[in-house]
Amino acid sequence: MGKKKSDTASGGAIPEGDNEKGKKIFKQRCEQCHVVNSLQTKTGPTLNGVIGRQSGQVAGFDYSAANKNKGVVWDRQTLFDYLADPKKYIPGTKMVFAGLKKADERADLIKFIEVEAAKKPSA
């Protein structure tokens, strides 16, 4: 009721997610390597504009061959699957993040990324 869901690859559903909870998760688990509100890269590539972008395509970022060659286009479903276990989803990725096992946490993080990454970057 009231929560929109998307189908998952396993036939389940992706919870809609909570932007504020996602913001907290981003600050705790992602912000040390990624930004969403600018085009700069850190240890990881910017996530600004990530929805709809193909993996390994941020100009100036040194991706692993695995990430460049995966050819996935990031959307709610692909991010949901990737964030569960990045090294399983893209074997050979340089990303050291172990993943988020809880579906609700992944959905919250994705909601935050959807909202923030769609905004015009600061620089």
From Swiss-Prot:
Binding site for heme c: 30, 33-34, 95
Gene3D superfamilies to which the protein is assigned, alphabetical: Cytochrome c-like domain
Any single biological process term in GO: mitochondrial electron transport, cytochrome c to oxygen
InterPro entries xref list: Cyt_c-like_dom, Cyt_c-like_dom_sf, Cyt_c_1A/1B
Subcellular location: Mitochondrion intermembrane space
Any single Gene Ontology cellular-component annotation: mitochondrial intermembrane space
PROSITE patterns xrefs: CYTC
SUPFAM superfamilies, sorted: Cytochrome c
Record keyword Cell wall biogenesis/degradation present: no
Name the record gives this protein: Probable cytochrome c 2.2
Organism: Caenorhabditis elegans
Classification lineage: Eukaryota, Metazoa, Ecdysozoa, Nematoda, Chromadorea
